[in-house]
Amino acid sequence: MIREKTNKISIIGAGFVGSTTAFALMQDGLASEIVIVDINKDKAHAEAMDLAQGAAFVKSVDIKSGDYADTKDSDIVIITAGVGPKPGETRLDIINKNLKIFQSIVPEVVKYSPNSILLVVSNPVDILTYITYKLSGFPKERVIGSGTVLDTSRLKYMLSEHFDIDARNVHTYIIGEHGDSEITAWSLTNIAGANVEEYCKTVCANCDGSFKKELPEKVKNAAYEIINSKGYTNYAVALAVTRIVEAILRDENAILTVSSLFEGQYGIDNVYLAMPTIVDRSGARQILDVPISNEEKENLIKSAEILKGHIANSELD
C-alpha cells in the first residue's frame, strides 16, 4: 500500500492565536499530526482535547499536547507564544518581554526539529523573526514571519467593501513592517487589471480618491480597535497563518507578503520585512524585487531603519 506523505505541525503557544490556528489547520486538513506546546500544560491539554473531540468531522488528524520532545521531526513549527500588546501599547513596546520568551523556545525547537521551517507569528513579528533567525542558525529561507499577510487581507477586504466587489478580485500588498510604519503599495494595487486609481475613475461616480488616505490608517488601526474591544485578535490571523502553511506544504510557489530576510533588495540589508515573496516547500524562496514608486521605496527604507533601531536597542546579544 502506498502511504501518503504525512505532515507534522507543532504550535508553540496555546493562547487565542495558537489554538485558533490549530482549529483552522484541522479544518483545512493540512496536517496529519498537530502538537500544541505551552508553558501552561493544562491549557495546552484542554485545547488539544477540545479539538480532538471534533475528529469525526474532519480529515484524519492526530491532535495532542506535549512538551518540546513531542515536537520532534516537525515539518513546520509555528511560534505564537509571547506577550501581546495591551490596550494603548504598540507591537514594538513588547520586544524585550518576548525576546526572553524566544530565547527559551527557539533552542528547544531547533534541538528536536533541525530540518523544520519556523513560522513566527508573535509580535513584533518582523523583529522576533529576525531574532529567531539569529537564535536558530537556520538558513534564511526556513525562518519566516507572518509579515503583512493579514494586513494585506484587511486592505483587500476594505477595498472590496469600498468598491462593492469580491475581495478575491482585489490585488494589492501591504509591505514593510507589520505595524505602524507599514506601507500600502498603491503602485501594485489593481482591480480587473486596472490600477486602482483608473478603476476608481472609470467605475465609481464622484471618486475623489480619499480612500487612499483613509484605508491605510484603518488597516493600521484594525488590530488595536479589535484589541480595545475584545482584548485580542485571533480569527483572521489564524486564517493568514493557515494560508502560509498551505503554500509551504503544497509547494505552491505562491506570492505572499511574508516577513523575509532582506539582503540588498531596495538597498536594505540584514532585517526582516514583508514584501511579495515566493513561498514553496523550501520556505521563503525569493523576495520579488518588484518595481514600486519612489515614495514607497523611501518609506520601505524608513520602515527598515525603524526596525533596525529597535533591534539595536533590544537585549539581543
From Swiss-Prot:
Pathway: Fermentation; pyruvate fermentation to lactate; (S)-lactate from pyruvate: step 1/1. Pfam families: Ldh_1_C, Ldh_1_N. Allosterically activated by fructose 1,6-bisphosphate (FBP). GO terms for biological process: glycolytic process; lactate metabolic process. NAD(+) binds at residues 17, 38, 43, 68, 82-83, 104, 121-123, 146. Disulfide bonds: none annotated. Beta-D-fructose 1,6-bisphosphate binds at residues 156, 171. Substrate binds at residues 91, 123-126, 151-154, 233. Homotetramer. This is L-lactate dehydrogenase. It comes from Clostridium perfringens (strain 13 / Type A). The gene is ldh.
